[in-house]
From Swiss-Prot:
Phosphorylated by host. It is found in: Virion; Host endomembrane system; Host nucleus membrane; Host nucleus. Keywords: Apoptosis, Host cytoplasm, Host membrane, Host nucleus, Host-virus interaction, Membrane, Phosphoprotein, Viral budding, Viral budding via the host ESCRT complexes, Viral matrix protein, Viral release from host cell, Virion. This is Matrix protein. GO terms for biological process: viral budding via host ESCRT complex. It comes from Isfahan virus (ISFV). The gene is M. GO terms for cellular component: host cell cytoplasm; host cell nuclear membrane; membrane; viral envelope.
Amino acid sequence: MKSLKRLIKSNKKKGDKKNVSFMDWDEPPSYSDSRYGCYPSAPLFGVDEMMETLPTLGIQSLKIQYKCSLQVRAETPFTSFNDAARCISLWETDYRGYAGKKPFYRLLMLIATKKLRAAPMSLMDGNRPEYSSMIQGQSIVHHSLGVIPPMMHVPETFTREWNLLTNKGMITAQIWLGITDVVDDLNPLINPALFSDEKEMTLTSQMFGLELKKRNDNTWLISKSY
């Protein structure tokens, strides 16, 4: 009887070894099988480990250098600045530019739209109206948009056709935008004096996807870009 028990015990141990060998080689454990202490170790590309621990940045001040050249052709003349803003705000349809620059591009396009001037010859009978403007310089922009990625001063060109019930045409914009490290005091880019009044500035900025807010010191900031 003792011999029989030893034989059964010996066969059982051999069977266990066969099972282990089979699991190790023919059917390896899953990638996250905790029995083997094996867990995924591949990096999560595109996820910044610091993003969850960043404190609220609050209001920031960004010194930028910029240039924006804007050309617009229309089927009929614009009747007002609001009319022009409504049409030109369509410049970012199917936007494929730098995502981090988009809020500041919107601000530059708003200002460039305010400064549009018509070519006199284009307003003659039979011609399609042509408008153009160009702004450039160095300014400071206050914002509460969170982390802004590095921005190199390189050009991007946007060409878009627009078509509304009342008018249609073509928009061509070339924009240079980058962060500057100048130590000089710079004038704010958001300046209500460029507009008829503060209401005009805030309402047309909404057409361009921006929310501007006035601070206690009477300076303005980009509070939201949507």
